[in-house]
Amino acid sequence: MDADKIVFKVNNQVVSLKPEIIVDQYEYKYPAIKDLKKPCITLGKAPDLNKAYKSVLSCMSAAKLDPDDVCSYLAAAMQFFEGTCPEDWTSYGIVIARKGDKITPGSLVEIKRTDVEGNWALTGGMELTRDPTVPEHASLVGLLLSLYRLSKISGQSTGNYKTNIADRIEQIFETAPFVKIVEHHTLMTTHKMCANWSTIPNFRFLAGTYDMFFSRIEHLYSAIRVGTVVTAYEDCSGLVSFTGFIKQINLTAREAILYFFHKNFEEEIRRMFEPGQETAVPHSYFIHFRSLGLSGKSPYSSNAVGHVFNLIHFVGCYMGQVRSLNATVIAACAPHEMSVLGGYLGEEFFGKGTFERRFFRDEKELQEYEAAELTKTDVALADDGTVNSDDEDYFSGETRSPEAVYTRIIMNGGRLKRSHIRRYVSVSSNHQARPNSFAEFLNKTYSSDS
């Protein structure tokens, strides 16, 4: 008997077959650099920076930017942002810089140039006869890179959210050490003409390079990061959510994973903690691997680890966290089962803490406290008194153990308790639910049961 096959009859003929479903066609690619070569792109011929500045600024004012020219200018302008490396900087075996070295964003990557000239059109508008200053270059670089952040804001965002952000970014780049170089609302108007620029590989690469540089190097123009910060841990929402979850419930990653009672977690946990990746290394290429083109399909995205992502946000919903209530459910990753486990884990970690005295007036008081705690433990071990089983949770030191939670779930037949459902309905019904969000899912699934 083949365990994978089913047997049935069609027109009195016995049929035996193995039902198969579509599997994920994509290969997840890990970002580790194996060849000791810095991330690389190829651009057109390096421009005259003064000419390039005037061209790009005039095109921006006319909302007619050429992405190739913009990328060529951004790469050439890196020379204006020299800084000192505070420590030896290595990643995946590549020496980026040594302590005390003078470096620019260009030191982090390799930019190859061809002999192809850019367009460098002048479209009129703000004619500049003199050569631009460094603050003017910095302002233009900041505004151009902000197009990346604006194009990453999803269409679901409500009201004037994007316009407000664009206006705030403009204010940053017209305040010292930057200078005002465009009229009000230019950034938003330009963005509408460049709404998909976050998908242009070279533009994305340069945004990630600038961000990686300014996140480590103290610099007068570090505020340029306002437009590039979204490249850090891009397409890593699964891993980022897991990290936040760990901090929230005050456990180590190892301790937390012991509570993940579902077979579908196995593959995702293996995927998320693949050896050889610099997930925990500060200032690694890992942080910007998506924008630097080191992986075509992230193994750390919410879709790649959907069961983990769903569980974490159901626990977050139970705890009343707005971020979790607003997050988008990964519909293909057992949301009903994850909501059950999320209810039990939410109950386990919500409103409970492990508290103990840690600070004392002097050493004598510390020693007295430790001695008293030892005596208390000895008394507890000697006491064989029983308690009412309903009160077991309050007396047992093991209430927060994975075994205790697992037993509770099994005893309840793998279903949520009434108290869990009431809590889920309470937090989700008081929230303006976005389409496909966890709040909407909980409302639709459990409101009739409460």
UniProtKB/Swiss-Prot annotation:
One of its GO terms (molecular function) is RNA binding. Keywords: Capsid protein, Helical capsid protein, Host cytoplasm, Phosphoprotein, Ribonucleoprotein, RNA-binding, Superantigen, Viral nucleoprotein, Virion. It is found in: Virion; Host cytoplasm. InterPro entries: Rhabdo_ncapsid, Rhabdovirus_ncapsid_C, Rhabdovirus_ncapsid_N, Rhabdovirus_nucleoprotein-like. Pfam families: Rhabdo_ncap. The modification Phosphoserine is found at residue 389. Its main location: virion. The keyword Cytoplasm does not apply. Phosphorylated by host CK2. Unphosphorylated protein N seems to have a better affinity for leader viral promoter encapsidation. Phosphorylation of protein N in ribonucleocapsid may stabilize the interaction with protein P, thereby playing an important role in viral transcription/replication. Gene3D superfamilies: Nucleoprotein, Rhabdovirus nucleocapsid protein like domain. GO terms for cellular component: helical viral capsid; host cell cytoplasm; ribonucleoprotein complex; viral nucleocapsid. It comes from the Viruses. Displays a superantigen activity in human and mouse, activating mostly V-beta-8 subtypes of T-cell receptor. Homomultimerizes to form the nucleocapsid. Binds to viral genomic RNA. In nucleocapsid, binds protein P and thereby positions the polymerase on the template. Protein P acts as a chaperone on free protein N to prevent it from aggregation before encapsidating genomic RNA. Encapsidates the genome in a ratio of one protein N per nine ribonucleotides, protecting it from nucleases. If expressed without protein P it binds non-specifically RNA and therefore can bind it's own mRNA. Interaction with protein P abolishes any non-specific RNA binding, and prevents phosphorylation. The soluble N-P complex encapsidates specifically the genomic RNA, with protein N protecting the genome like a pearl necklace. The encapsidated genomic RNA is termed the nucleocapsid (NC) and serves as template for viral transcription and replication. Belongs to the lyssavirus nucleocapsid protein family. This is Nucleoprotein.
